[in-house]
Regions:
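Hydrophobic transmembrane alpha-helical segments in integral membrane proteins
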Residues: 1-14
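Membrane-interfacial loop-to-transmembrane alpha-helix junctions, especially the N-terminal start
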Residues: 29-37, 83-84
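Membrane-proximal helix-loop-helix units in multi-pass membrane proteins
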Residues: 82-138
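Alpha-helical transmembrane segments and their membrane-interface exit regions
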Residues: 64-73, 90-95
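N-terminal signal-anchor/start-transfer transmembrane helix
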Residues: 12-24
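Conserved small/polar residues in nucleotide/adenosyl-binding loops
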Residues: 141-142
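Short, aromatic-rich membrane-interface segments at the entry and exit
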Residues: 56-61
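A generic, lipid-embedded transmembrane alpha helix
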Residues: 38-53
């Protein structure tokens, strides 16, 4: 149960990263409060999908891509093609940062790459470090 709450926290962090990325790079269609609410609501749906699919990586990747495309289309002035392109960039950065941190922990601690599924301490460490790295990567894509 505690791990579910941490995953919810991670999804909220990802919602804010998507909000920052799209609103920093495109003209806003929604006021900040509504835009943040839309992002959090969409990512909450992603969190529910994550619970239902038992953290299936491929389903989660597809869900996040769809969430980011929908969020971009409703919150900023962007074409569908650009929304898909930029959502794919966000997805790739998120996936790469998570995989990078999981690989480092797997190598250094001599644990399975998906040890976060069964070890709450590893989940917290990998989750926080990968999201900080994700935020940094997203922030530096458009200096």
């Amino acid at each position: 149960m505690v791990s579910h709450l941490f995953f919810l926290f991670i999804y909220i962090v990802e919602a804010f990263i998507a909000y920052m990325y799209f609103t920093d790079n495109y003209e806003k269609k929604l006021k900040a409060g509504f835009s943040i609410l839309a992002s959090c609501a969409l990512y909450f749906i992603g969190f529910i999908v994550n619970l239902v699919d038992n953290n299936n990586v491929l389903i989660n990747l597809a869900t996040i891509l769809i969430i980011n495309v929908v969020y971009a289309l409703i919150s900023v002035d962007i074409t569908f093609k650009s929304a898909v392109f930029h959502s794919s960039i966000l997805l790739a950065l998120m996936f790469l940062t998570e995989t990078f941190i999981q690989s480092i922990f797997s190598f250094t601690l001599k644990v399975q790459i998906d040890a976060y599924r069964n070890d709450f301490t590893i989940l917290i460490i990998v989750g926080i470090i990968s999201k900080v790295l994700y935020l940094m990567a997203v922030s530096y894509t458009h200096l």
